[in-house]
């Protein structure tokens, strides 16, 4: 089976927001584009964070923050895993599985966002990547490891 580069599998049309964008506007962009996350980039388009639907729910809505005045920099995930478009998809799959992350910003050598790789992208290309590899990756991403906290 041919080795596939991340650039062949990733989504290339990526929306992004700046750290000072308010949470409400970021959520609207995500909703309008049917996406579950959005990279947060500085003026040079370098990734400084990622905002997920989960971040909005747990760090803004559940904390009763005013979304129209709360900048995404206050609720975004700052420890962002990224991958390079020239690397093999298997490298990104390992990163996603080991860290249980569903979406990975794809950045060039200058850390500028050029795409995003999602579980959906992997599923769309499963025949080229290897169906069993994709299934294993998704299973590992979704497998809850460790103890869970009872919120009730």
Positions of PLM-derived features:
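Tandem CBS (Bateman) regulatory domains
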Residues: 1-13, 52-97, 119-152
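Short charge-dense sequence patches
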Residues: 3-11, 21-26, 40-47, 115, ...
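The conserved cystathionine-beta-synthase
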Residues: 16-34, 41, 83-100, 107, ...
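A glycine-centered beta-loop-beta connector
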Residues: 30-33, 38-54, 96, 104-120
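A signal for specific C-terminal beta-sheet/loop modules enriched in small/flexible residues
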Residues: 34, 65-66, 101, 112, ...
């Amino acid at each position: 089976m041919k080795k596939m580069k991340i650039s062949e599998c990733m989504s290339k049309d990526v929306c992004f927001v700046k750290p000072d964008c308010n949470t409400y506007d970021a959520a609207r962009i995500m909703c309008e584009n049917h996406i579950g996350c959005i990279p947060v980039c500085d003026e040079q388009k370098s990734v400084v964070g990622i905002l997920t639907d989960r971040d909005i729910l747990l760090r803004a809505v559940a904390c009763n923050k005013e979304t129209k005045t709360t900048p995404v920099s206050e609720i975004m995930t700052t420890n962002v895993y990224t991958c390079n478009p020239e690397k093999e998809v298997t490298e990104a799959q390992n990163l996603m599985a080991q860290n249980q992350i569903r979406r990975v910003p794809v950045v060039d050598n200058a850390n500028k966002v050029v795409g995003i790789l999602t579980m959906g992208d992997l599923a769309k290309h499963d025949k080229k990547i290897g169906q069993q590899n994709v299934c294993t990756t998704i299973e590992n991403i979704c497998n809850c490891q460790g103890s869970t906290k009872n919120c009730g």
